[in-house]
Swiss-Prot record:
Residues 45-78 are annotated as: Disordered. SUPFAM superfamilies: Ribosomal protein L4. Belongs to the universal ribosomal protein uL4 family. It comes from Geobacillus sp. (strain WCH70). Disulfide bonds: none annotated. Keywords: Ribonucleoprotein, Ribosomal protein, RNA-binding, rRNA-binding. PANTHER family: 50S RIBOSOMAL PROTEIN L4 (PTHR10746), LARGE RIBOSOMAL SUBUNIT PROTEIN UL4M (PTHR10746:SF6). Part of the 50S ribosomal subunit. GO terms for molecular function: rRNA binding; structural constituent of ribosome. It comes from the Bacteria. GO terms for biological process: translation. Pfam families: Ribosomal_L4. This is Large ribosomal subunit protein uL4. Gene3D superfamilies: 3.40.1370.10.
Amino acid sequence: MPKVALYNQSGETIGEIELNDSVFGIEPNKHVLFEAVIMQRASLRQGTHKTKNRAEVSGGGRKPWRQKGTGRARQGSIRAPQWRGGGTVFGPVPRSYSYKLPKKVRRLAIKSALSSKVLENNIVVLDNLTLEAPKTKEMVKILNNLSVDRKALIVTDDVNENVTLSARNIPGVTVVTANGINVLDVLNHDKLVITKAAVEKVEEVLA
């Protein structure tokens, strides 16, 4: 089982914690990580694109000129696709791009993402993360104590309003709960700062 240092909020090492091998110690599967990121990014797309077809464009109800005798090509509507200002043929319509990967694949992806952070030595485990009041200054101080000066994902075991509000204005820092941890967030941040309680919760779900 991989062992990592356990820190307090002052940045002091207070011991070690053993991480579950089946969650934090597997060989990262790059292909599964790729598939999971594509799935998440697809679900973020708005899908609100829309063009009008000839039935939806205003006007064009009357035949522009008679069928025969003018020497011109026959036309039925000034809103046909070949006309300027006419409708679009097979244009985009609103749709959802989201789809689901199999549950086993999704679980393997998050395990691979977490294991990659352990392999890169980019995981920081805290014994506890508590703030008496929402203060950005205090959160910055804690991150500095832990030598976390880059993009960081903070994972708590449950919703912590003070932590969330304190980190909200720090560029590159995101706070999620153990239940809300996902592949895109883990890979999109350089450091993973996770509480001991959150580790236990993640292992309980994924092990």
